[in-house]
Amino acid sequence: MSEHSRCPVTGRTAGNPVAGGGIANRDWWPNQLHLDMLHQHSSLSNPMEEAFKYKEEFGKLDLKAVKKDLYTLMTDSQEWWPADYGHYGGLFIRMTWHSAGTYRTGDGRGGGGTGNQRFAPLNSWPDNANLDKARRLLWPIKQKYGKKLSWADLMILAGNYALESMGFKTFGFGGGRVDIWEPEEDIYWGKEVEWLDNKRYSGERDLENPLAAVQMGLIYVNPEGPDGKPDPVAAGKDIRETFGRMAMNDEETVALVAGGHTFGKCHGVGDPKLVGPEPEAADIEEQGLGWKSGYGSGKGDETMTSGLEGAWTPDPIHWDMGYLGMLFKYEWELTKSPAGAWQWKPTDVAEEDLAPAAHDPSKRVPTMMTTADLAMRMDPIYGPISRRYYEHPDQFADAFARAWFKLTHRDMGPKSRYLGTEVPEEDLIWQDPVPAVDHELIGDREIAELKKRLLASGLSIPELVSTAWASASTFRGSDKRGGANGARIRLAPQKDWEVNQPEQLKIVLQKLEEIRQEFNDAQSGGKRVSLADLIVLGGCAGVEEAARKAGTDVTIPFTPGRTDASQEQTDTESFAVLEPLADGFRNYMKKKYSVSAEEMLVDRSQLLTLTAPEMTVLVGGLRVLNVNFGQSPHGVFTTLPETLTNDFFVNLLDMGTEWKPLSKEHDTFEGRDRKTGEPRWTATRVDLIFGSNSRLRAIAEVYGSDNAQEKFVHDFVAAWNKVMNLDRFELG
């Protein structure tokens, strides 16, 4: 064998495997618990220095200069990818829409907040065809501003300024989206293994949770109709389900569709079989670009993207009422695009309602509508809304501006996270507003006094700890919703969630409110404590007392400043999606699910931004603190409950215990003395996974060691403090 074919470092030949190749553990054991999602986006994959703070860099940005550069780019048509109608606005709007539009309310994942459209699988979804060109067109802008402007912000900003450059007044823009540097491993996009497959339905047409899109690789619905069948009324049902799961009501949905489709065109000339592979599958010389078409030049008027062909309006680069005007002015006839996709054409169209050819303004061509577009007229709910918008252009413009702002900011959390000079002043209900602090905050002396009152109140350690956990653990790192700030645990719908044990919660909250009122009334100055702060402080006091009982004195850091939201500031329907279907930290399962309890624990831990060690120490600590749902004994592996010991780990790892399932589903278990057969403990899958899974057992062994008690307490306190403050963005 030639020495030229041998690696000078490893000695391997060209045909040999390399590091990282071969069969992975998950190939051998596909049901293995997926813990890697807890350790994403570390400094090991991030090229930015540790001290880098995007908020500070964005603050140095001149948005007016960025806007000017983007305006220039919009009409600077490039030969390698010419602009339709001489304006890239439609392309950038689609890029922005598809970046933000992956958001779903079920778990808060997706959306445009991380710049994830740059990575697989999104960069290669069929619905994102040729958006690689949009991002490549933006590279000179990104290159110019570098670390001051993230890709995530730029992809949203480009769509906003595209709208403005074509005559539309947007609602505003908030920056602050921080880029990720690797694909997200936590987002479930579906079980399908082929593009555009739809094995996500059960029953008549029940879409699997938490998914929102109807097919693998689509952002929303199939524009040709459900399963490619051109039925506008049936399409309306799909649209309502999908947009609803993306946090949009019927009026917002119509505004988004009608407003967004006022601009740009679809591309569907030539044979789809002539389109090359997506970016992730393209050859190396394509340099990250995909979908190279062999039809003619493959660009301009010979572009192939969705397979649909044509513009929606006679003037696709200006804001007007053209979309709704065409929708209601004409009857529509089913036809097929040159690429063979179902679409609709207007009958007896007038000359003035023809659109210019995208790359030859001397030619006039018919407009089109998709099956999904016709749902805006034919659906019994969407139809009247569309008609009202058509008859009231100002109302339509305002609705689209607000819906577009919601689309592009829904995953960013509260308004306090928005950056820049274009943030609108108005508070919006979907931003989960909380009041500003309007009083002097308590200090160390008052904090110590309140802890004494809380511990002397008659409330138990489990009551104090479980209430604080219930309040804070609603937080989702995905869309930055939930958390203890606002004290919404006392409001609908949270006060009535089964997992929060409403009867017990009511008693605890009444006692906490008494303490709060008595304390505030006794203050001669302006100091006050909010119920939100007191709930968290009560949990901290309970943890500290439990640690003291175990022989370790600790003080949990406490920073006041939370405020109490009102019911009027709380959208009950919107908050309903935050209800835990399972909370392994409290050993709670609402019902039996197709996924295991331990998988749901890892999922919730990821939403809480916890690492595997943090998840492990929290479960072990909360078990001995006796905060299980319904005070269940499962996993309470201690004879000293309400004492913060490492007993959970010591007894879990005790080989003197033999475990047997109590149910045929293997979801509850009994541990008996291996010699005598005497019962010792009961447990759930969430408890036993820390002894069964090799990675979690390795962590459990750290905390189960004879000299681990102090480390266990301090690690528990650190993880507890993290959860209590997840929504305190102002502290970051």
From Swiss-Prot:
HAMAP family cross-referenced by the UniProt entry: Catal_peroxid
Stated role: Bifunctional enzyme with both catalase and broad-spectrum peroxidase activity.
Record: active site: 98 (proton acceptor)
PROSITE patterns for this protein: PEROXIDASE_1, PEROXIDASE_2, PEROXIDASE_4
Record-level GO cellular component terms: cytosol
Name of the protein in question: Catalase-peroxidase
Positions contributing to heme b binding: 261
Organism phylogeny: Bacteria, Pseudomonadati, Chlorobiota, Chlorobiia, Chlorobiales
Gene transcribed to yield this protein: katG
Residues at the site labelled Transition state stabilizer: 94
Pfam family for this entry, one: peroxidase
Modification after translation: Formation of the three residue Trp-Tyr-Met cross-link is important for the catalase, but not the peroxidase activity of the enzyme.
Organism of this sequence: Chlorobium phaeobacteroides (strain BS1)
The reaction(s) this protein catalyses: H2O2 + AH2 = A + 2 H2O; 2 H2O2 = O2 + 2 H2O
Subunit structure and binding partners: Homodimer or homotetramer.
